[in-house]
């Protein structure tokens, strides 16, 4: 089973939250209103949090209400330039799970600018967003030895 995440924008805090879609939801969006978002400083994720769920390839932090560490990012209201996307984020995140070198933060930033926010801009959103990816996840993966699919496009 590939990991699936959904995006929720909190305009009050200028934060885009990525959340894993639970195995029990079978691909449907997470229940609850879009306005229900975690506090600005979420508590630390317990090491066994979400271990009972069967999403192969996700680190345990993926089941936090704040979303997986590697995909948490904040946004600013101005984006100076539009950068061409690099279409290999799934491969990059797979390499991260294996401990291999991956894209720079700048490349990941470009990917999200073009692929996540493109639709909003094409629909006439006036707010332009710049993405900052936070790295350094301290959580262990729940899968082994099968290949890990940390993220797949829909």
Curated annotation (Swiss-Prot):
Keyword tags: Activation of host NF-kappa-B by virus, Activator, Apoptosis, Host cytoplasm, Host G2/M cell cycle arrest by virus, Host mitochondrion, Host nucleus, Host-virus interaction, Modulation of host cell cycle by virus, Transcription, Transcription regulation
Region annotation (Mitochondrial targeting sequence) ranges: 68-117
Ranges where the record places region Disordered: 28-48
SS bond partners: none
Described purpose of this protein according to its UniProt entry: Multifunctional protein that plays a role in silencing host antiviral defenses and promoting viral transcription. Does not seem to be essential for HBV infection. May be directly involved in development of cirrhosis and liver cancer (hepatocellular carcinoma). Most of cytosolic activities involve modulation of cytosolic calcium. The effect on apoptosis is controversial depending on the cell types in which the studies have been conducted. May induce apoptosis by localizing in mitochondria and causing loss of mitochondrial membrane potential.
Entry similarity comment: Belongs to the orthohepadnavirus protein X family.
Protein name: Protein X
Taxonomic path: Viruses, Riboviria, Pararnavirae, Artverviricota, Revtraviricetes
